[in-house]
Amino acid sequence: MSQLDVLILDDEESIRNLIAANLKDEGFNPKVAANSTQALKIISEKPVSAVILDIWLQGSEIDGLGVLEIIKKRYPLIPVIIISGHGTIETAVNAIKMGAYDYIEKPFNNDKLIILLKRACEVTKLKRENIDLKSKVIDKTELVGGCSVTLKYKMEIEKAASSSSRIMIHGKVGSGKELAARLIHKQSKRVNNPFIIFSPTCMTTEKINQELFGESEKQENNNKRPTILEFANNGTLYIDEVSNIPIPIQVKLLKFLKDQTITKPCGKKTKVDIKIITSTSKNIQDEVNNGKFLEDLYYRLNVFSLKVPSLYERKEDIPLLVKYFVKQLSKFSGLKERHFSDEAITALQSYEWPGNIRQLRNVVEWTLIMNPLTTGNNEIIKPYMIPSEILANSANLTKLEDSFDMLSMPLREAREVFERQYLSAQMSRFNNNISKTSSFVGMERSALHRKLKLLSLHIPPTNKINEEEYEKANA
């Protein structure tokens, strides 16, 4: 067995030394601490495999149950074995409820402690393997897609991850800002340390103040509970929709950013090392101009600016995203894995997706739920199975609403109506990219330019690459 680090926290030196000697004989690597401050410092520097914790800890700033609470919140997989010579059944029950692996009384049998410790480490090992297995089955930090916009975005994320600067992620609701933050953390040097998400949107000013800085109107809550900033020490703190933080808290956050020091109400100062990532779906510059966001705070947080592309800009990724969501839902929601027809994919690509990736996932899930697999006849998802609002707002490619009117038209006029609908839909599908549209429909670019002009289809450019082609098409 490879050596496992085990922390022994007890206020009695003789007990610490005795347990440490016994653990060393059994192949463990013991680390000792006399109080909560020493113990939490040891764990923050390098998480241990297990903790043996005395419940009383005389002379310690935080008692055993308080230390247990902190460990289980910061490092939920570390097993904690409680030991005490003055315990009661009520204390033991409370410790187990708070997440302790087990509870034994002093004086204890050394063999029993060793067996308990080995069992706790083995259980934790199995939990970690299970988590690793689940993460391999489906990676929650996977950025699906291979279009040019997505590839460029992936490169920007890599640059952000290698930077030590603070990062602000800009993107529309549902575009995947949290995913971007997770990817940055995953690819950074802090990957093995905490990734903490803080969302202040639905919190009161008092609650935000308490969570970030440990300040509460209830004096008994002050100083005891570790803050979000302490939880994120040595790791990454992701603040979602940072523009929703009230001005008084912005002032405190700005002060914290200057030296990354937390000052508790009691006056105690704690230095932390955190990579801070923030996100917003609002135009922060407008918020600054309107006096809703501190300009200095904006500049300190927006050192590295990352823009998340909307799904509208990534329409070519929709087929891959649909496959990904179908596979995800079949594995974790029990829904049967299905195939979306080319016509259904085309309908999805023709929609503008104001709700972005999140909306697409919801649509895929709704479609699978509302069209259960009953026979082989409905194994393939057809356009009519997709939510009606998606089809109603998609470009008119999968159906011809004017089919009855066209029956009364001469062939030349009917063909013009069809071509206008068809090319309009295809241009929308490929985000107004002339090259990709011409390739798909089987026309030369110059021929497509002429056809668009002939049909009076003036498609505005969506990026600089298309500007020259747009001018040619509308010349």
Swiss-Prot record:
Entry keyword annotation includes Transcription regulation: yes
Pfam families per the UniProt record, alphabetical: HTH_8, Response_reg, Sigma54_activat
Highest taxon of source: Bacteria
Modified residues (4-aspartylphosphate): 54
InterPro entries cross-referenced by the UniProt entry: AAA+_ATPase (IPR003593), CheY-like_superfamily (IPR011006), Homeodomain-like_sf (IPR009057), HTH_Fis (IPR002197), P-loop_NTPase (IPR027417), Sig_transdc_resp-reg_receiver (IPR001789), Sigma_54_int (IPR002078), Sigma_54_int_dom_CS (IPR025944)
Record-level GO BP terms: phosphorelay signal transduction system; regulation of DNA-templated transcription
Phosphoprotein found in the keyword field: yes
Residues that hold ATP according to the record: 171-178, 232-241
Keywords, alphabetical: ATP-binding, Nucleotide-binding, Phosphoprotein, Transcription, Transcription regulation, Two-component regulatory system
Molecular function GO labels: ATP binding; ATP hydrolysis activity; sequence-specific DNA binding
Residues in Response regulatory domain copies: 5-121
Annotated Sigma-54 factor interaction domain residues: 143-369
Protein role: Member of the two-component regulatory system RT0550/RT0603.
Full protein name: Putative response regulator NtrX-like
Species of origin: Rickettsia typhi (strain ATCC VR-144 / Wilmington)
